[in-house]
Regions:
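Intrinsic disorder/low-complexity segments
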Residues: 1-7
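A structured beta-alpha segment of the ubiquitous adenosine-cofactor-binding alpha/beta core
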Residues: 61-85
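NAD(P)+-binding Rossmann beta1-loop-alpha1 motif at the extreme N-terminus of oxidoreductases
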Residues: 7-60, 64, 80
Length: 85
């Protein structure tokens, strides 16, 4: 897993509408790169599924030694789950 640590200073916060496969992936890469990520999906069930998948992905990366527990928590804290636009 390669995460770029070069962040455009004008893109420290991004919003993702739609937490399907692509939305979840984009959100995770952005959060792991240091961006604050606001995520929204019209279906609450998709937000819950996304949270569960994020936790599972970060747990796997931590267990494999790719990231530390502190990094995992920092990534999770960069997510802002939005239930309305």
């Amino acid at each position: 897993l390669i995460i770029l640590n070069v962040i455009d200073p004008f893109m420290l916060k991004i919003g993702i509408v739609g937490m399907g496969t692509m939305g979840r992936g984009i959100a995770q890469v952005a959060a792991m790169s240091g961006c604050e990520v606001l995520v929204f999906d019209a279906q609450s069930s998709m937000l819950e599924r996304s949270k569960e998948e994020l936790v599972a992905n970060l747990k796997s990366l931590t267990e494999k030694g790719k990231i530390s527990q502190a990094e995992s928590e920092a990534v999770q804290n960069r997510y802002h789950w939005c239930h309305q636009l």
